[in-house]
């Protein structure tokens, strides 16, 4: 062992074979045209599989930018990806005129209070892929036994100037402890009963109810036919009745189930595939779950769904049955229940989604999100197969501003594809190459 008793130089040998040097991390960035995903928003992607999960698969019309991103991820593990869409792009919606919702921030700003007038749901992102979605929501009326689907007049009777109809209670239960009696109105033709309109299909029936027609006439009779139970009832372990939070507040019938289906197979490859489902959510705006997190169905769908946004409350409800959806559960309210068909008349197929390729200005706007080096860490900026004006924009307005990132601009496809032996000459002589700003970045 060496000792130093006075100032001098001490020489030591150290084995560095067990030292693993730190590897510099490179972060890529790209703005482009992708099939799916949030638009004009930076999303960190870590792998090729992750790229497909967030932005969809490449298609025959949308593949250049996906391939560039995929190639980078074959070597790197961090790619900041921005999807941009054209002005004509639209999210698929339940009904009405489709809207464009680029990302969650714009949703919160413009549609979170139900301003869209497009029905209860919209696809999470713009594009035709959203047209494959079907959304169903069920409460106790559609997931608890059968409901009255139709009536048949078996005898028109005579002498009626006014008539009423009553339905017997669900077999074996009473409205207070397990079912709701159906209701309806009678239409006359002359002095005869012509038809019965169901105003509330009820629920909890195991056999068809008995119909009794009253009024100032006589001899009119009718029968009821039950409709099929909710198609997706078996996807859930329990009937949506009342949540614990609502029960503690004295409220009832606030619970709903929501399920999202790939109706056409365009997403999963198999029509009818269940994409996601949410059990035991609440109609109450103040609802909390067992972990004290929001359980209001609107909030849960917006925060956790990968496929849809809430856009409005359903209109097919029995308005006379209780408080509106979105009310507080305080004060022991009974919430309105769904009405209409066996599925609560809330099976919604989304449509009117539109794909639209981004224009040059859209792509420039996307790359502009990389300009602030204090907010975004990026080292390598990929231009893909964009117009010369986009590459120039990246150089002048991103790289030259940041001064810490390199820009990678690909040659024009015509210069390198089917041009064997002349690639370098074509690249150097191309007018596009000469048009770019000269920069050390």
Language-model segments: residues:
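Conserved, function-critical positions that sit in or immediately flank catalytic
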Residues: 145-228
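A glycine- and small-residue-enriched flexible loop/hinge signal that marks low-structured segments
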Residues: 1-145, 225-441
